[in-house]
Amino acid sequence: MSVLHDFLVFGLVGLVAQFIDGALGMAYGITASSFLLAAGVPPAHTSASVHIAKFFTTAASGAAHASYKNVDRRLLLTLAIAGAVGGAFGALVVTTVDAALIKPFIIGYLALMGVVILWRILRTTPQLNLPRQGVAPLGMLGGFLDAIGGGGWGPIVTTSLIGRGGEPRMIIGSVNAAEFFVTLAIGSALIATIVTGHWKDAGDILNNAAAIAGLIVGGLISAPIAGRFVSVVPRKVLGVAVGLLVLTLAGYQAAALTGLL
């Protein structure tokens, strides 16, 4: 494929992926990674490419959510610090830990949380207080799994916090804003392992420069739109959308894991 073709294709991928992530608080990494892998990009290149692109898209997304008052500063600070620590640690061990070993547990957890979200939204009285207990450990876990598996910050953190009864708009905005700092930590660590030669299978990431640029440009275009979208959509609609998205992602990953896809 030509450089221009790669840029245009992944520009569209970045636009769609960032809109999903900005509006629902998850799935940029999973969406972008799926297209990169399908295009024949090696897993190591895919993870690093997505995190490089997210340097820019998460900054734009976080700024958009902040401008629409979708961010709780206390929650943002806790998630940013904890997620960055967990993400950096995960990036440092990703060359020695097989992500496939923990993937079945992640899939099961996501499916469970998807059911919990739908149950809370459709069957119970909404609890609109933002969760404060256990946020730091959750952020560390989300950052760690995001680095290990190439995605997972949004599905793990957003899903868990909404599942506890938090207001989706504020949860999604705060988690998206914190993701910039998590991505910065993960991306920096991944690049360091590639440059120093510790990640033997990474190869020359510059081969994917056009795809990375496309992901960045597409994401920057859609970030403000998604930030506005989440600020006006009713809580029940947003919560149901998140729950269904989580179940869909879990089902897709389970099918891929068992060889059905």
Q: What role is predicted for each listed range?
A:
Residues 49-64:
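Transmembrane alpha-helices of multi-pass small-molecule transport proteins
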